[in-house]
Amino acid sequence: AVARLAMALAPHARTVWIACGPGNNGGDGLEAAALLQQWGRRCVVTWLGSSERAPADARASWHRAQEAGVVFADTAPQGLGPQDLCIDALLGIGLASGKPRNADTSLLTLLQALHDAPAPVLAVDIPSGLQADTGTYAPELIADSAYGTGAGSLFHAQNTLTLLTLKPGLFTASGRDAAGTVWFDDLGADLSNEAASAWLAGAPA
């Protein structure tokens, strides 16, 4: 899903830079990199994970990316232009639990690079640092002087592909600006039998 939308959004891209976190959101980025490389794009991945600690699905995607010839680098590639594309696959909904996440230097550096990139950004599931339930930025990112002192300094994606379900945070608070154009893919999942998460009070019988 990510790779298909990337091709549609940036059909003339020569280079796609994908910033990947250590979890499953990063795994989605790695999978997209493998496919885009196979489809003739030059893909450069900066991965904060490792094959030893990655979830099984992310590890499998890492193997496919390597086999496809994806370049792994510590920083964003030089020469990105407005026709190219950046993909934010760093955090996803990893902040939804409300548990504190240490904003380490590597993460902050990549967030800043996405913020400064001349190419547009496609976020996977939700822009990194945005909380999926509230649409507010993670306090530890806002407060960190290495990245910025206010939500306005955090990067905004031009497009966001949200997967499986629509996240409330994409449409509330800072999310409306941070997410850009929101695209949705349910990945073929049938959620019709899922228990309702809320009920409408006073609904007609």
Kindly give the residue locations of the regions a language model identified.
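YjeF_N-associated NAD(P)HX repair module
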Residues: 83-205
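Nucleotide and nucleotide-moiety/phosphate-recognizing core
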Residues: 3-92, 96-124
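Small-residue (G/A/S/T)-rich helix-start motifs and N-terminal tracts that mark the onset
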Residues: 1-49, 54-55, 59, 149, ...
